[in-house]
């Protein structure tokens, strides 16, 4: 007996040990905690570090963290204490509704080992909700003939809590006619019913006020009240009855909104108002009323909102049928939602390494990927793979986790960046798939310096620019990446006119945009040479340079300056001499002006603005030569005043004026004597002088009117002949003003003396001068003159058509040419032809301008003449052959000197406006006139 017991005890002990071992092995990979709902954020849940066998400090070192699938994080890890704590306030009713056991599963990832531990946390319910009726008041109509013992169902209260904290009992306020009966069903729900204890008498009491109290079993106890108003009516002793107490229906989750599910039906054997049945949807269980709709008249149940199998797989709908007086009955509808493959797989990058060195080994971990599909069954089976022929592969980890690793060695010289595409497909029909992309950079070293696309750059900026204006932008490229390709720009330090280059321009170190730090002046300097350095941010940094030439463009910001006649300092006006015997075209003087600008801004034209004797003098449009327009008469005043305007061709044009005084006399003593004799004779008889002036004004007006008529007739006649010439095709084309630009950047002369010489023996033939009786104070536009000259030249050509000799260009006057010793340059050592053309280099131009300025100053002082000796270009004697032009600045580029193949001369014939003898035999003698 003892041996048997021992054998039996040993066998039982062995079975017990085996069972305990199995339980320990089963629970070794799962951790479970419990926590109450509505705890504050950071409340303790469990010591996760201890349960994982780790120290708290190892949580951060080994990358221990919580991973979840798209759900809001309810818990977090405390790295200091190694505890699992709440991440926010948890509401069990929102999380699990009325499920008795509320479990939340989370995954703990140990990243260094790529291990995942599953943790289950039970959310315990607390009594934080009171029972609540769907309405605060209920009206029940009962016939007075209703027999005692009749039961009247009452709307139930709803408490979202579970267990003892849920709804436990109902209590009715004390009264003489009604009592409360509570029915319990298998699911544990309690349905209150109002029981009539004694017959009602409407004549005694028509309305009864009752209060129904619903209480839960929590601590403290919560309760809710329903105010019941009983109205006594005539008899209605039959409530509506459903055809079946429970309806079942299945529906696919993707059915459209508005789809009819089924139609419920309830009947009432009463008649009239007592038999009118209406259907009511019980709104207590959460959001059922938002998803389903019950027609109160027909009993048709339809869908109000799209169904989702992943949100809810099953719905229980409670409905009521109520007749007219208020009797009702209950039924329920069970809706099963069927799954369809409407969810594509979800790919979550749990851990990612964005860059790897090119010398990395095979099998290096790049990313940890979680793949999940919310569908069920075959629709939730997922496969994942790498797209394309890339040196990467996926390795299966635990659960639905995969590791992305390198399959071969990487070579940055071939590919510096990989765009890895992952595709996950489920097993549904048709299958759904999802793609995600991972960008992987291969780490490089700084082995490439920045490079510019061009060897050098040229930039242009107009002068008088605002400070801070953007000038130019340079861009360099670096094939490296990250800091090795981050380029900064700088200017190499240098000086310009004694000032540091950084005071003129600056460069944005990030964008390479150059800015002007001051306003540039074309007359001060015309170009800057810069050296831009581009450096990367590698270690060590690499750099390269590029040259930038900055050219300043001229603007018309300088008005013409009058060199001759020079403005006196004592307030007096210089006097020019014109002999009485001067013929038309006699050169009285010449206005010399310069413009500090260049190009078109320095092209000068001359206009006669005002004259004391209109029609007596004319001014060359481009030469500034003041000549007599007609022969001097005895009636002409001894003293003539002229106002000459000099205007450049800039936009807008700038101008300057000078006043000339011309004395009509052969010598200075004569003009002094004549002016002295005129003083006393001007006063004797003012009345006779007034009469003479009136008669003179009338005569001049008549002459002017006749002159205008004759002039119009001549112009019409010439225009008619020019049209005939153009029609026949045998005429010579007019020679317009030149619009070519010279090699030194200055526009070519608009017209030349060679035109006059080649057309006629008379030097003034091609320049018809139209006397103006009245002069405005404004400048005559150049366009009006340019439009009139071709017509006049064409007429002269028509008149000379019969004589072929007149159409040949006269040879240039040799007196206008430079000898080898007189040529501007380094002591006349320059080589060139003997045509006397202007030198083209900038240095010689500046010397000639200074020479003209000095000569004009001497002429204003009376110490020299405009003529000078032969070969002096009409300047002072000290600028003759013995004085070269290499030491003086050149203003020639701003002085307008007409003539393409001739230069200034001292020949009397040319100065007086005489041309070489022509073929008409009317050779005129040159007057030997000199001027002061």
UniProtKB/Swiss-Prot annotation:
GO BP annotations, alphabetical order: cell adhesion; endosome to lysosome transport; homophilic cell adhesion via plasma membrane adhesion molecules; lipid tube assembly involved in organelle fusion; nervous system development
Q: Keyword annotations for this protein?
A: Calcium, Cell adhesion, Cell membrane, Glycoprotein, Membrane, Repeat, Signal, Transmembrane, Transmembrane helix
The answer to whether keyword tRNA processing applies is no
Protein name, as recorded: Protocadherin gamma-A3
Q: What is its main location?
A: membrane
Q: Which residues lie on this side of the membrane: Cytoplasmic?
A: 714-932
Q: Where is the composition biased (Basic residues)?
A: 922-932
Cellular localisation? Cell membrane
Topology relative to the membrane, per the entry?
A: Single-pass type I membrane protein
**Gene3D superfamilies this protein is in?**
Cadherins
Concerning SUPFAM superfamilies, the annotation shows: Cadherin-like
Q: What does this protein do?
A: Potential calcium-dependent cell-adhesion protein. May be involved in the establishment and maintenance of specific neuronal connections in the brain.
The Cadherin domain covers which part of the protein? 30-133, 134-242, 243-347, 348-452, 453-562, 570-682
Q: List the ranges whose topology is Extracellular.
A: 30-692
Q: Any transmembrane segments, and where?
A: 693-713
Query: What range does the record give for the signal peptide?
Result: 1-29
Which residue positions carry a glycan here? 265, 419, 545, 685
Q: Name one GO cellular component term.
A: plasma membrane
Question: Which residues does the annotated region (Disordered) include?
Answer: 805-841, 902-932
Q: In Gene Ontology terms, what is one molecular function of this protein? A: calcium ion binding
């Amino acid at each position: 007996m003892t041996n048997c017991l021992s054998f039996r005890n040993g066998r039982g002990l062995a079975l017990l040990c085996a069972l305990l071992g199995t339980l320990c092995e089963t629970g070794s990979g799962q951790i479970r905690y419990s926590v109450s709902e509505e705890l504050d954020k950071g409340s303790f849940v469990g010591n996760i570090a201890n349960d994982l066998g780790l120290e708290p400090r190892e949580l951060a070192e080994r990358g221990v963290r919580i991973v979840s699938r798209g759900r809001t994080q309810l818990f977090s890890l405390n790295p200091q204490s190694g505890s699992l704590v709440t991440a926010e306030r948890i509401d069990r009713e929102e999380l699990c509704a009325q499920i008795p056991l509320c479990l939340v599963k989370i995954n703990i990832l140990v990243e260094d080992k790529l291990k995942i531990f599953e943790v289950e946390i039970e959310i315990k319910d607390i009594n934080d909700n009171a029972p609540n009726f769907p309405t605060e008041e209920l009206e029940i109509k009962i016939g007075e003939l209703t027999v005692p013992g009749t039961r009247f169902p009452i709307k139930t209260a709803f408490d979202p809590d579970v267990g003892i904290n849920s709804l436990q009992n109902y209590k009715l306020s004390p009264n003489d006619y009604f009592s409360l009966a509570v029915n319990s069903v298998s699911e544990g729900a309690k349905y209150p019913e109002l029981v009539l204890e004694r017959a009602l008498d409407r004549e005694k009491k028509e309305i009864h006020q009752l209060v129904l109290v619903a209480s839960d079993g929590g601590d403290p106890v919560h309760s809710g009240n329903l105010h019941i108003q009983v109205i006594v009516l005539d008899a209605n002793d039959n409530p509506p009855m459903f055809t079946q107490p429970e309806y079942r229906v299945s529906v696919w989750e993707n059915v459209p909104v508005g789809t009819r599910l089924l139609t419920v039906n309830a009947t009432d054997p009463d008649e009239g108002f007592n038999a009118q049945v209406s259907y009511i949807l019980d709104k207590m269980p959460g959001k059922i009323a938002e998803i389903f709709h019950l027609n109160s008249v027909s009993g048709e149940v339809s869908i109000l909102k799209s169904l989702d199998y992943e949100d809810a797989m099953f719905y229980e709908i409670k409905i009521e049928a109520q007749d007219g007086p208020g009797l009702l009955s209950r039924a329920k509808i069970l809706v099963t939602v069927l799954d369809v493959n409407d969810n594509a797989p979800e790919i979550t990058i749990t851990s990612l390494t964005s860059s790897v060195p090119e010398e990395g080994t095979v099998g290096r971990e790049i990313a940890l990927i979680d793949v999940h599909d919310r569908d069920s069954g075959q629709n939730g089976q997922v496969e994942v793979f790498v797209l394309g022929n890339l040196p990467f592969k996926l390795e299966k980890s635990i659960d639905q986790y995969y590791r992305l690793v390198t399959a071969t060695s990487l070579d940055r010289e071939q590919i510096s960046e990989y765009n890895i595409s992952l595709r996950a497909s489920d097993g549904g029909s048709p299958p759904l798939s999802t793609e995600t992309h991972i960008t992987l950079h291969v780490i490089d070293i700084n082995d490439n310096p920045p490079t510019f696309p061009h060897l050098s750059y040229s930039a242009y900026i107009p002068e008088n620019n605002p400070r801070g204006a953007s000038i130019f932008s340079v861009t360099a490229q670096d094939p490296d990446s990250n800091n090795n390709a981050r380029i900064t720009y700088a200017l190499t330090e240098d000086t310009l006119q004694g000032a540091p280059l950084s005071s003129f321009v600056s460069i944005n170190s990030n964008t390479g945009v150059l800015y002007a730090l001051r306003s540039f002046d074309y007359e001060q300097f015309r170009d800057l040479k810069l050296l831009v350095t581009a450096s990367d941010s590698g270690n060590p940094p690499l750099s390269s340079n590029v040259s930038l030439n900055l050219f300043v463009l001229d603007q018309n910001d300088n008005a013409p300056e009058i060199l001759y006649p020079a403005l006196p300092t004592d307030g007096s006006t210089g006097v020019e001499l014109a002999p009485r015997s001067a013929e038309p075209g006699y050169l009285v003087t010449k206005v010399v002006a310069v413009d500090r600008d260049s190009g078109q801004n320095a092209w000068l034209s001359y206009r006669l603005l005002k004259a004391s004797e209109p029609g007596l003098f004319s001014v060359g449009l481009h030469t500034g030569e003041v000549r007599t327009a007609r022969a001097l008469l005895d009636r002409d005043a001894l003293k003539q005043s002229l106002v000459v305007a000099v205007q450049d061709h800039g936009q807008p044009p700038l101008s300057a004026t000078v006043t000339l005084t011309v004395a009509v006399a052969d010598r200075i003593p004569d003009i002094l004597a004549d002016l002295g004799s005129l003083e006393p004779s001007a006063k004797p008889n003012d009345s006779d002088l007034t009469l003479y002036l009136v008669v003179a004004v009338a005569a001049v007006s008549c002459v002017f009117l006749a002159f205008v008529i004759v002039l119009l007739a001549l112009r019409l006649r010439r225009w008619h002949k020019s049209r005939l010439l153009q029609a026949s095709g045998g005429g010579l084309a007019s020679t317009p003003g030149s619009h070519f630009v010279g090699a030194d950047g200055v526009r070519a002369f608009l017209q030349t003396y060679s035109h006059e010489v080649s057309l006629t023996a008379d030097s003034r033939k091609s320049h018809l001068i139209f006397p103006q009786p009245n002069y405005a104070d404004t400048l005559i536009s150049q366009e009006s003159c340019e439009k009139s000259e071709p017509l006049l030249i064409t007429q002269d050509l028509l008149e000379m058509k019969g004589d072929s000799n007149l159409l040949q260009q006269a040879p240039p006057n040799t007196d206008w040419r430079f000898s080898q010793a007189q040529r501007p340059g380094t002591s006349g050592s320059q080589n060139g032809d003997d045509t006397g053309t202007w030198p083209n280099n900038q240095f010689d131009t500046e010397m000639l301008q200074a020479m003209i300025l000095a000569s004009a100053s001497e002429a204003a002082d009376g110490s020299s003449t405009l003529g000078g000796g032969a070969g002096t270009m009409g300047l002072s004697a000290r600028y003759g052959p013995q004085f070269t032009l290499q030491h003086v600045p050149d203003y020639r580029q701003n002085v307008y000197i007409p003539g393409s193949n001739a230069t200034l001369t001292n020949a009397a014939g040319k100065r007086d406006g005489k041309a070489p003898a022509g073929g008409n035999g009317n050779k005129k003698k040159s007057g030997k006139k000199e001027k002061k």
